[in-house]
Regions:
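N-terminal helix-turn-helix
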Residues: 2-12, 18-98, 363, 382-464, ...
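Short, solvent-exposed recognition segments
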Residues: 145-227, 506-566
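Conserved segment of winged-helix/HTH DNA-binding domains
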Residues: 90-117, 147, 458-486, 504-505, ...
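Short regulatory alpha-helical segment in sensory/regulatory domains of signaling proteins that mediates
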Residues: 112-124, 480-488, 492-495, 549, ...
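A short beta-strand signature within small-molecule sensing/ligand-binding domains used
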Residues: 227-235, 243, 566-574
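Short hydrophobic alpha-helical segments used for membrane anchoring or interfacial signaling
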Residues: 124-130, 137-139, 493-499, 506-509
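Juxtadomain coupling helices with adjacent low-complexity linkers
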Residues: 209-211, 216, 331-392, 545, ...
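Flexible loop/coil segments at beta-strand boundaries within sensory signal-transduction domains
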Residues: 237-242, 324-328, 576-582
């Protein structure tokens, strides 16, 4: 029987713009089904489901699920472990395309990380995603009680500190959509990153918070998500769109896709700016100085905020023509626990420092150079065609081609025409157009009046949240298992210890022989006596002082023959990160009786280098906008 793709995709309200809307006639059905598969995997614990569970979760026929999974596996977007389907790090290239086009993580993450270090609290950056907020950067603290949200997680606006700040710019249509979602999903079941609501709050409460945010210029989350969690947020605005009387905070992106920023409208000063700081004393000073109108703005804005009237609060605060300026590009938040800060304490102790960091972020945006577009993806259409020829009906070419359209975007390529997308991917205009129609229906791309298209934050719903926490051992493990199966010897991954004189094994795969190296994860050995250790030590600045390490650096591998233990031979190569630093090493360990050292290098070293290349490729994708833990 035919699968009901529309209903399966729309259950969480994420697959279509406004719930279960009719699928356009020109939409690519296999592409919609593939998006549904990726979203169900994203929502699953650990980013994995069995094929049977995936069949139930999507409502698709088992044969359809098998073909979609086979195609996604060919693209390295998922991997099969027996009958289980796991999201794979390569899938993060879709979310990376959105984050690169946005530019904000690259420009502002350093400031957020520095603030987290200064305050010893978690700091996040979020963008608005319709009636929710979605994280684009997280700088978390390691504590027994720490923040568990991930880059790409979607939260309902009303249960967060950033939400009211984004809601200030909502239109009546936006508010209507929010009310509809609240009525249809009162417990927030569509937001898997959150625990379900225990008590349903009144809509008027969020409206009051948004009206207050229009006046204060900041917002607070006092344990709205769960007991103990508190946060304070301040908006980051595009250059020239501050809280100026007569201009204010406008809707729209504020971002000129592909070129930079909205036009600079200047930084005016008035009573609204004082109100934005929550400075009542400042308003009184303005009145004392003869600025009665400015003082009235403050009082009127606060009165409207108390009534929950967002639009009138903005007007009273001096917002003026809300369509005439740029918008908030993201919101910066400091997140803490009530054991360290109460909600009032956040305002008094942390708000000034958060404001200072946001001011520095806005300066960085003002002085940011134009984006420099990198090379677009090449040969994708040829690759999909070749895969179809090789795999036949098990490869769903329309799914693969449709997903490659998302990779056409990136830094300096934030807004693209249909022709540019077709040229970048190698697709025909007709194929690219149908893919864009499908992605627009799924909420992944948005058209603009100038006939260009841009990615939306919803692209991050395709696997990014669970994969953003992927560690290097998790990346390496399936490749080590494959390597051990090919060469029939034990394979392992290791890093240097904090002291630098030992290695620590972080992942391994057994070779299946009677005589094989049996070292458990967590084992530590002297670095100088192991092939893994010598590869890691050879990357240090002082390595040239040692002839042994100098040779390892020159040859790109290390061979240790019965030095650590009689009969044990090992060869190792480095694993490098995006910056070219050696962060780990992989090795093959075997019994010395199974051939000469020359035979070992001839038979094993090429396989080992190939495995390291695969690990590095996935590490580069996973580490572009996320920290990848090495242990």
């Amino acid at each position: 029987m035919p699968a009901n793709t529309t209903n399966a995709a729309a259950r969480d309200g994420a697959a279509v713009p406004d719930g279960p809307a009719a699928v356009p006639d020109e939409a690519v059905a296999p592409l919609l089904r593939g998006i549904t598969v990726l979203r169900r995997l994203t929502e699953a614990d650990g980013g994995a489901l069995s094929l049977s569970a995936l069949e139930r979760a999507t409502g698709l026929a088992r044969s359809t699920v098998d073909r979609l999974v086979a195609t996604l596996a060919r693209m390295d977007y998922v991997r099969l472990d027996g009958r289980d389907v796991h999201l794979a790090p390569r899938l993060m290239e879709l979310g990376n395309a959105y984050l690169a086009a946005l530019r904000l993580p690259a420009l502002l993450a350093g400031r957020a990380d520095a603030l987290a270090d200064e305050l010893d609290e978690s700091v996040s950056l979020a963008v608005g995603d319709r009636d929710g907020i979605r994280f684009i950067h997280q700088a978390t603290r390691r504590r027994a009680i720490s923040l568990s949200f991930r880059i790409g997680d979607l939260l309902p606006a009303e249960r967060t500190a950033p939400g009211p700040l984004f809601a200030v710019g909502w239109t009546p249509a936006d508010w209507h959509r929010w009310h509809e979602r609240r009525a249809a999903d009162p417990r927030d079941d569509r937001f898997p990153a959150l625990p379900p609501r225990e008590h349903v709050s009144a809509d008027a409460e969020f409206e009051r918070r948004a009206a207050r945010a229009a006046v204060d210029g900041w917002a607070l989350d006092d344990q709205l998500i769960e007991p103990g969690l508190v946060a304070i947020s301040v908006p980051v605005r595009a250059p020239g769109t501050g809280w100026a009387r007569g201009t204010g905070w406008a809707r729209g992106t504020g971002w000129a896709p592909g070129t930079g920023w909205a036009a600079d409208t200047g930084w005016a000063v008035g009573a609204a700016e004082v109100a934005g700081a929550g400075n009542v004393a400042g308003a009184r000073e303005m009145a004392g100085a003869g600025d009665v109108e400015g003082a009235a703005d403050v009082a009127g804005a606060r009165e409207m905020a108390g009534a929950g009237d967002v639009a009138r609060a903005r007007e009273a605060a001096g917002a003026g023509d809300m369509a005439g300026a740029g918008d908030v590009v993201c919101v910066a938040s400091v997140v803490s626990h009530t054991s360290r800060h109460t909600a009032p304490d956040l305002r008094s102790a942390l708000l000034p420092r958060l404001r200072a960091a946001v001011a520095a972020m806005e300066d960085d945006l003002r002085t940011a150079p134009p984006a420099h577009p990198g090379p677009p993806p090449a040969g994708l259409a040829v690759w999909t065609g070749a895969s179809k020829q090789e795999l036949g009906r098990e490869f769903v070419e329309s799914l693969a081609r449709g997903l490659t359209v998302l990779t056409a975007f990136g830094e300096g390529r934030a807004a693209l025409t249909l022709t540019e997308i077709a040229r970048a991917t190698g697709l025909t205009r007709a194929s690219a157009r149908r893919a864009l129609i499908t992605h627009e229906h799924a909420g992944l791309v948005a058209p603009a009046p100038d006939r260009t298209y841009a990615l939306t934050p919803r692209v991050l719903s395709l696997g990014f949240p669970p994969l953003s926490r992927t560690s290097l051992p998790e990346i390496a493990q399936p490749h080590l298992t494959t390597l051990a199966g090919r060469v029939h010897e034990s394979a392992a991954l290791a890093v240097l210890s904090d002291t630098g004189d030992e290695i620590q094994y972080t992942a391994r795969a057994a070779g299946g022989r009677v005589l094989s190296a049996r070292v458990t994860v967590g084992t530590r050995l002297p670095a100088h006596a192991t092939a893994l250790g010598r590869v890691l030590l050879a990357d240090r600045p002082d390595a040239t002082a040692s002839p042994v390490l100098r040779r390892v650096r020159e040859e790109g591998h290390a061979l240790v023959d019965e030095e650590l233990e009689a009969g044990l031979r090992a060869v190792a190569v480095p694993v490098r990160d995006r910056a070219g630093r050696v962060v780990a090493a992989v090795n093959i360990a075997m019994h010395a009786a199974r051939g000469t050292t020359e035979e070992c290098l001839t038979r094993v070293l090429p396989e080992l280098r190939h495995t390291a290349d695969l690990v590095e490729a996935e590490l580069r994708v996973a580490g572009r906008f996320c920290r990848v833990a090495v242990v």
